[in-house]
């Protein structure tokens, strides 16, 4: 049989029990601080119970907001946010009009304590330009989140040497850093552009389709390499621009 030992507990109006501030409550062998089990649930629908370091409170914990950057700008921290998780890729490399495709951008991910930070500069890498059969496609440019993490763009087709697919970029500074996928070489008809962390490239071309691949080049995942064309008279698709995704945590 359990026993409840009380000392100077007083009841008011038959419903409210007041415990003196000097009295400690123990539950399951653990002391409950501030004589409080839970704050009032009134007005706290869909919120969780947690601690702000001083008191037990109701609040929205975990990831409670997201900011997405598809162009360069400034990240401004939302109220009450202490940590963020950032994922970003650079710009994908451009492709050739005849078989060779671009490399995908690198990827980086990092969890950052932002309790002492209010804003961070964000740079989004641009996709590389396409080329005709014999030229060199442009490389994608780098994305970055302040000085915390960055990711280089993918190489364009024919950058290393003629008829070579583009090499993937690489992330840096993150808790996770990855290469982007490489592009296809000459002779790989309908070869895909390099895949980024976020997905693949647009549809590939065909001589009877003319500029088909280039016309649909924006239907690609961020940071992916340009898909190859399949006819030397047409300009290859560009690489896809980068992206930065910021999850905010309280």
Residues covered by each model-derived region:
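Feature marking protein-protein/ligand interface regions
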Residues: 9, 184-190
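Short, surface-exposed beta-edge/turn micro-motifs
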Residues: 43-47, 82-83, 241-242
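Short sequence segments immediately N-terminal to proteolytic processing junctions that release a mature
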Residues: 26-30, 47, 121-127, 221-224
């Amino acid at each position: 049989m359990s026993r409840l030992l009380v000392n100077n507990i007083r009841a008011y109006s038959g419903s409210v029990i007041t415990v003196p501030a000097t009295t400690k409550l123990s539950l399951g062998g653990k002391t409950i601080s501030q004589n409080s089990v839970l704050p009032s649930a009134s007005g706290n629908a869909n919120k969780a119970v947690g601690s702000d370091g001083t008191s037990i409170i109701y609040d929205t914990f975990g990831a409670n907001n997201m900011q997405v950057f598809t162009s360069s700008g400034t990240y401004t921290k939302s109220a009450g946010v202490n940590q963020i998780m950032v994922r970003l890729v650079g710009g994908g490399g451009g492709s050739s009009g005849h078989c060779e495709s671009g490399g995908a951008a690198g990827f980086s991910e990092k969890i950052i304590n932002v309790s002492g930070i209010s804003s961070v500069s964000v740079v989004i890498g641009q996709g590389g330009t396409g080329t005709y059969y014999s030229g060199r496609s442009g490389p994608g440019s780098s994305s970055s989140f302040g000085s915390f993490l960055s990711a280089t763009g993918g190489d364009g087709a024919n950058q290393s040497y003629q008829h070579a697919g583009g090499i993937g970029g690489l992330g840096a500074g993150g808790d996770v850093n990855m290469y982007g996928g490489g592009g296809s070489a000459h002779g790989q008809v309908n070869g895909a552009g390099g895949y980024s962390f976020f997905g693949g490239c647009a549809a590939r071309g065909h001589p009877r389709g003319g500029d088909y691949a280039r016309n649909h080049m924006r239907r690609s995942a961020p940071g992916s390499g340009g898909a190859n064309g399949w006819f030397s008279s047409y300009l290859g698709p560009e690489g896809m621009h980068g992206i930065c995704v910021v999850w905010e945590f309280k």
